[in-house]
């Protein structure tokens, strides 16, 4: 690990960003693909009502992802910071407590969602026509949320341990499996949205298992059974370091909840109806999530670099890293803006087709909603 520490403190910033951010971006994109792939196959196999149903369930996944990223990114930042300060024992406590709190919160969220699923779906704008698809889909997805949360938390920590390729492989394995299982369950077994949910849970479990196996392979710290003791002071520090990721994700959840309800209310009085606007919003959000995954991935990949150099007192390298991240993000957002404004119909059609009203609202919503992506 000493070699890794020297690299973080001496290697060219652009090279380090690419090394740590690319696997991180791929991991986040793969995590997003679970929902995106579901929607693509559901759109062609069930129709836009099926897509609308997954859209009102999606915020529940985002809530869980917010906690997972808070604990994962927080623990990874804590790990890098303590390694920079040469405090390996403290670093191992941060890793262990990040994993422990993720396990506890994931189980609590799973139980809560299963108990209050219909009520939660109503909060996120579920209509009567969407409910018959959303409830069975959401119930199955909820069962797999602990695997998704713990796997995501571990993924962030594994990257900070200097093994971004392993983290990438674990996520890619699950995504490939999900892509294979989705058409089998939806079209071959004719299970509709339930089939898509089952495929997702199985794939998340595989990713979870691969990441769990890494615990004994940590290079920077030694994780023993004794290390797994709840320390609320450490949890507080870990959470504070990852709270920005939490706020980012939860703000998206709040936006989706408000927009679903507003679109459902006013859409029902228009020629589009309630379901078309809700479905379109979800699809637009999924495509937007691809861009967000890239931007967040760049930032998350920079965390170990910033954390180590800040802990080592190398403020010049910290500033250089921030400048590189901001300029890269601006360039990518500009390219995305051009695509979103010029070919919305092509992007929407990936998720299935609909009537004239559906496509009309889809193109309109796409251009308006993603008008300011350049500000990401």
Annotate each PLM feature.
Residues 1-21, 200, 211-252:
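Interhelical loop/hinge segments that connect adjacent transmembrane helices in multipass membrane
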Residues 9, 175-208, 274, 345:
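Membrane-interface helix-loop junctions in multi-pass transport and translocation proteins
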Residues 15-76, 244-265:
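Signature of the first transmembrane helix
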Residues 51-111, 148-167, 260, 280-344, ...:
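Small-residue-rich hydrophobic transmembrane alpha-helices
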Residues 72, 141-159, 167-175, 196-211, ...:
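Short runs within selected transmembrane alpha-helices of multi-pass transporters and secretion channels
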Residues 108-139, 335-363:
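Short membrane-interface helical motifs at transmembrane helix boundaries
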